[in-house]
Amino acid sequence: MAKEIKFSEDARSAMLSGVDKLADTVKTTMGPKGRNVVLEQSYGTPTITNDGVTIAKSIELENQFENMGAKLVAEVASKTNDIAGDGTTTATVLTQAIVNAGMKNVTSGANPVGIRRGIDKATEVAVEALKKMSHDVKTKDDIEQIASISAANPEVGKLIADAMEKVGHDGVITIEDSRGVDTSVDVVEGMSFDRGYMSQYMVTDNDKMEADLDNPYILITDKKISNIQDILPLLQSVVQEGRALLIIADDITGEALPTLVLNKIRGTFNVVSVKAPGFGDRRKAQLQDIAVLTGGTVISDDLGMSLKDATVDQLGQANKVTVTKDTTTIVDGAGSKEAIQERVDQIKQEIAKSTSDFDKEKLQERLAKLSGGVAVVKVGAATETELKEKKYRIEDALNATRAAVQEGFVPGGGTALINVIPALDKIEADGDELTGINIVKAALEAPVRQIAENAGVEGSVIVNELKNEKEGIGYNAADGKFEDMIKAGIVDPTMVTRSALQNAASVSALLLTTEAVVADKPDPNANNQAPAAPQGGMGGMM
């Protein structure tokens, strides 16, 4: 396909237009007085949300050069969401501020490489200043405050705090639909381990890129599956019952994995395969833990068992299994309480006998997974649209809370970013490098300015007032007053604020140093071409 190329100012201005279109849409949601955005869906009802990354990912612009600029900002939001789980709107606002100021200077003749060095230096100093002002999460109230601010809902904050209290800071918390309109927290037996799906074609939810299996059978084996014939009798039995299947195996290689994926895509059955957790003897022990939890049997050479002879009775079962690219969570396994308790007691005895600190630590992890359970937040709402919006808020709140547990929290409402500006004044630089530092200093004001403007207040007035206040005093947009943000319970996770700034600075610096943009030239006849004939498919596996 022919390419269209733009250079220098033409390239940067086209991309800047895309950056602004996306950022202007996302930033309307910022702060306690932020608005919602309605997203059209290809099917079903529209989605109403204030979740920055969801909005950013849904935007496609007609002009391909503008679209590239928009996609780079969406990448900032997505990366921030991947690292910290929240802060996507802050990252977008910071990116827009840095890019706009940077483009003006580059257009005026400044050297973009010098500006980039200044941006990098300023970001490094700002991140260190954020870490120094960070406070550790110590109480249930701290967790409740962080979750409440992220979700803009005190009830959600209380739910998350209750869930974390029940399963611990490192415990597994999942989100499900409730059958009623109320939202509640239940603790069920379950566990999570660090292994994700073997193929992304196994996902059932393309937005979240995760696979959800309701009431599945679970095949647990320490064998390598390379021939589909080995598990064919078992697959046929599962298909006849109309149930989903989770396969936990040493590995699936050869033609076995493509065959499973092909049948999954065709809708023959719903299957997800993951590698067994752990290594060596620890792997065998963890597989046995999963078998006890789900009421299944480990199909193992050690026991003289064969996959060809395995029956449905030897499969484990669970109420629900969720698999992401990195983790597998089994909720409400079908194992008997007596068997689980017996296994727990056995692990406790092993801990008591062990003389190795490393072994004790690994045994404690197994014990926590087996006995800690999984907290399930059941989200209820009157309509499907409200349910989607509520789940987005709860997911953000949960992610923000986990981030705060890891790295602590700082004063919220953009206050921390204003408070780090004096640290940037101490950096020694000149010329274009100094310009880059000043660009970051100005950008650090943008989140507070946007929160104020969304609340109907002049942003510049609020920013100037905050610069004259002592550290920690911020603008509470919900009540329209200045106060100590930590005492008021308005806090942000340090990881969220840090990631937003680092990712915004990284992509902004790349945009400013862009000198040429290459895009596909639109084909004027594309809409007039007849659709391609459908391709023939392979026969079914069964």
From Swiss-Prot:
The lineage of its organism: Bacteria, Bacillati, Bacillota, Bacilli, Lactobacillales. Residues 524-535 have a biased composition (Low complexity). NCBIfam families: GroEL, PRK00013.1, PRK12849.1, PRK12850.1, PRK12851.1. It is an enzyme of class 5 (isomerase). CDD domains: GroEL. ATP binds at residues 29-32, 86-90, 413, 476-478, 492. This is Chaperonin GroEL. One of its GO terms (biological process) is protein refolding. Its main location: cytoplasm. Its EC number is 5.6.1.7. It comes from the Bacteria. Pfam families: Cpn60_TCP1. Together with its co-chaperonin GroES, plays an essential role in assisting protein folding. The GroEL-GroES system forms a nano-cage that allows encapsulation of the non-native substrate proteins and provides a physical environment optimized to promote and accelerate protein folding. It comes from Limosilactobacillus reuteri (strain DSM 20016) (Lactobacillus reuteri). It catalyses: ATP + H2O + a folded polypeptide = ADP + phosphate + an unfolded polypeptide. Residues 521-542 are annotated as: Disordered. Forms a cylinder of 14 subunits composed of two heptameric rings stacked back-to-back. Interacts with the co-chaperonin GroES. It is found in: Cytoplasm.
